[in-house]
């Protein structure tokens, strides 16, 4: 997970990737 304070968009994309991995 991207460190706090980083680009919110990058954090969102990282979370989406985690969710996609969980769905697969």
From Swiss-Prot:
Domain of life: Eukaryota
Gene Ontology cellular-component terms listed: chloroplast
Keyword tags: ATP-binding, Chaperone, Chloroplast, Nucleotide-binding, Plastid
Compartments in which it is found: Plastid, Chloroplast
GO MF, one example: ATP binding
Other facts: This protein shows ATPase activity.
Family: Belongs to the chaperonin (HSP60) family.
Assembly and binders: Oligomer of probably six alpha and six beta subunits.
Role according to the record: This protein binds RuBisCO small and large subunits and is implicated in the assembly of the enzyme oligomer.
Name of the featured protein: RuBisCO large subunit-binding protein subunit beta, chloroplastic
Organism listed in the record: Populus euphratica
């Amino acid at each position: 997970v991207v460190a706090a304070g980083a680009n919110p968009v990058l954090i969102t994309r990282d979370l989406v990737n985690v969710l996609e991995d969980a769905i697969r």
